[in-house]
């Protein structure tokens, strides 16, 4: 019998809008390293087509010969500085407080009440996850998520399916028993590569990108409940069977 056993939240932006804070942290790291790099909001939107902060740094450097003097070791240090500055923004004096995206807290609460397992399937560090939990100030019970996937637990970042394969194993469920929620095309590719039904909720910095791989696109999770998720999953899983039966009847 088809059933919904788990909901997987993907990238950080599915939980809370943090991309602008991350952009500011990258720029602060560049300034700290005395680099004349500065990412505008428009540039960062384009960079988000690639997953993983270090990968973005590598791609940005490699795109212009004038930046090739920055070594791989320098990039690693830049990313470490960005993480430190980002964590300070969320946990230090005068820390920024985050809000869950619309509908997230309600859906999480309903899943917990119905014993539907929860996972957070990121490509970020555990340090970043911890700082986000602090900045959410108890608004989301992330400690009750069955598993949180971080960069140290996988070999390849999204769009590779590694994070989802790991999450499914930790949850003890099959891909066809899960709904994923993602906010970037590259992360959706990872979910689909793992065979997981995926709902896209584009964020402030990813709206307008190509979400055609998603099974469904929503502005946010407002009003979305577990009964609707079950229905969407069932319709998705039975669609090939229905199409096959219809085609067979037509032949007869």
Q: What spans do the regions from the language model cover?
A:
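Active-site-adjacent beta-strand anchor residues
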Residues: 16, 119-123, 181
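Asp-based, Mg2+/Mn2+-dependent phosphohydrolase catalytic module
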Residues: 2-4, 109, 125-127, 131-252
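Substrate-recognition element of Asp-dependent hydrolases with the DxDx(T/V) motif
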Residues: 26, 95, 104-134, 191
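N-terminal helical cap/lid subdomain that shapes the substrate entry/recognition surface
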Residues: 2-102, 109-114
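Non-catalytic, surface-exposed connector residues within folded enzymatic/regulatory domains
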Residues: 20, 38, 69-72, 98, ...
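N-terminal-biased segments
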Residues: 59-65, 117-125, 148
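Residues at secondary-structure transition points
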Residues: 73, 77, 95-102, 123, ...
């Amino acid at each position: 019998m088809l059933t919904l056993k788990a909901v997987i939240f993907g990238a950080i932006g599915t939980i809370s809008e943090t991309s602008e804070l991350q952009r500011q942290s990258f720029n602060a790291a560049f300034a700290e390293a005395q680099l004349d790099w500065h990412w505008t909001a428009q540039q960062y939107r384009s960079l988000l087509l690639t997953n993983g902060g270090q990968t973005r740094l590598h791609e940005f450097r490699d795109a212009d010969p004038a930046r090739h003097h920055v070594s791989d070791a320098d990039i690693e240090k830049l990313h470490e500085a960005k993480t430190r500055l980002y964590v300070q923004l969320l946990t230090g004096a005068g820390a920024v407080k985050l809000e869950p995206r619309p509908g997230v807290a309600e859906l999480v609460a309903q899943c917990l009440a119905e014993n539907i397992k929860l996972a957070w399937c990121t490509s970020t560090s555990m340090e970043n996850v911890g700082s986000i939990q602090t900045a959410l100030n108890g608004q989301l019970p992330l400690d009750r998520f069955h598993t949180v996937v971080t960069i140290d637990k996988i070999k390849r970042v999204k769009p590779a399916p590694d994070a989802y394969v790991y999450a499914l194993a930790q949850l003890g469920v099959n891909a066809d028993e899960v709904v994923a929620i993602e906010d970037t095309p590259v992360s959706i590719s990872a979910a689909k590569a793992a065979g997981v039904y995926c709902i896209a909720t584009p964020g402030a910095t990813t709206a307008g990108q190509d979400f055609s791989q998603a099974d469904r696109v929503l502005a946010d999770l407002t009003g979305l409940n577990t009964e609707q998720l079950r229905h969407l999953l069932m319709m998705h899983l039975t669609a090939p069977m229905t199409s096959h039966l219809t085609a067979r009847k037509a032949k007869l």
